[in-house]
Amino acid sequence: MSDQVEIDLFEEWFEGEFDNWGQASSNPTSWAHIFVKHEKIDDHKFLTSSRYNYEPNKPYREQVVEVTEPVVLGAQVSIIIVKNPACDMIFSYIESEKMFLGHSCEGCMWKDKPLESKARLYKDKYHTWDKGYWQGSEGFFHFDKSYK
């Protein structure tokens, strides 16, 4: 896949609103119902926000992230870096699974605590796992893309 096709695909899948209603409703003691929104605000820049369902107009986390052009790092042929104020994320396209697999760079900190993040981005799903500041002992959040 060419670099431009890869970045276009990543941004198409990344943009939108996601929620984990299925996960939260099946196990409400372990999973809060959360909305995650990635809104394109400029070429390769997104305003990202996370909100609880009971405060839909009050994000608890909001930031601007920038998607960079794919680069070559070590054994990985092509990766996309999401520049994030908390911690940069590195994504690689896994063609056999039709997904982008992401992880945080080493040494990330959020509010003076270590942070390790993992993500899987599919056409209609976004799975995230933050360990450290938010604990993350239950595993991945499973967000489904909303089409309105």
Q: Where are the language model's segments positioned?
A:
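Short Pro/Gly-enriched beta-strand edge/turn motifs at strand-loop
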Residues: 17-21, 47-49, 100
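Short, solvent-exposed loop/hinge segments that bridge or flank secondary-structure elements
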Residues: 7-9, 15-43
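Calycin-type beta-barrel ligand-binding domains and close structural analogs
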Residues: 7, 21-28, 54-148
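Basic/polar N-terminal segments that are highly enriched at the extreme N-terminus
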Residues: 1-6
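N-terminal glycine/threonine-rich, aromatic-flanked beta-hairpin/loop signature
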Residues: 36-62
